[in-house]
Amino acid sequence: MTENFDKVTKKVEAMYMKYPYPSPSTESIQTNELLNLLKIFELENGIKLENVKFLDAGTGSGHRITNVAQHYSKCEFLGLDISEKSLEIANVLKNTKKLENIKFRKANLMNNISSLGKFNIVLCMGVLHHLANPAKGLGNLLGTLKKDGIIFLYLYGKLGGHKRMLNKKLISILLAKEKSNYGNGIKLIRELGLNKFEYGWNLNFKSNEEEDSLIVDYLLHANETLYDFNDIDKLFKKSDLYGYTIFGITTGTQGFLFDSSYDIRKKISIPQTNISKFLKSDFSLSYYKSLSLKDKCRVLDIIYEPNGYTIIGFTRQAYEKLSNERLKKNFVKIK
């Protein structure tokens, strides 16, 4: 099995060496999804992220994490990636922004990385689903968590990713034996008008080269696994975490904070999932109210059809410190 993992990892590495993601540009671009996520986490928990050690596992070309490091100047960051080309770009961005609180290094997440030390927060955003064995990769990442640490994951959604995967399959069939010919794949995608991006890929780009990287990651990726709620639950059950909660979901080009409640009284300016918009009568809501938390999550999964999930995994000590009522209400205990 190890040999197969190596083949997959090598394919992914070769792809990102040629098409760094999210951008081959060494210019700073507006990729603030990760920064906004952490700001919301601070706001809901009533905390300030200071003196925190972050591990960004699968940092790519560093555009997102350097924006984060610039904002959280009192925190330390280590960014890991399999692609040396991506890390070269990340280091240029680091130097351009004169950041002293972030370092980058090459690493394979399929290997034991515990020698890197312990971190308060591990970020693995849009990366785990590209590994040959996501469960093993998650285990390796958890080996770097402090006893009161948390991990943020972003995983592709199976239900909302259905059309994208059909388009990906179409291109794969057309390419036939040329599946690794990214240049021809990009040309086909443009000619068929399939370069219309969903959340995470719908970034501003200034050149065909920059769009090429988005196209490859979107429809030509060498390896990816998609998840629904049941798959997420199975993944976390195999881990050593105390439990997890779905922080948010994406559908199309829109993001929602995730909440299984049927009576959301706290009004915030950020869109949230809201079952009462779909189950409008007391009769239908009565059935929903009687469900377990997991079944409520399954119902929301089917209704919203996410193309992505942001999930937070908690150690026991981290959960005991948690003050965010929304996350507590939606917490799925494993142990």
Where do the protein language model's features map onto the residues?
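Conserved alpha-helix/loop element of class I SAM-dependent methyltransferases that forms part
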Residues: 18, 28-51
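Conserved SAM-binding loop of SAM-dependent methyltransferases across substrates and taxa
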Residues: 61-73
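Conserved SAM-binding strand-loop segment of SAM-dependent methyltransferases
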Residues: 98-110
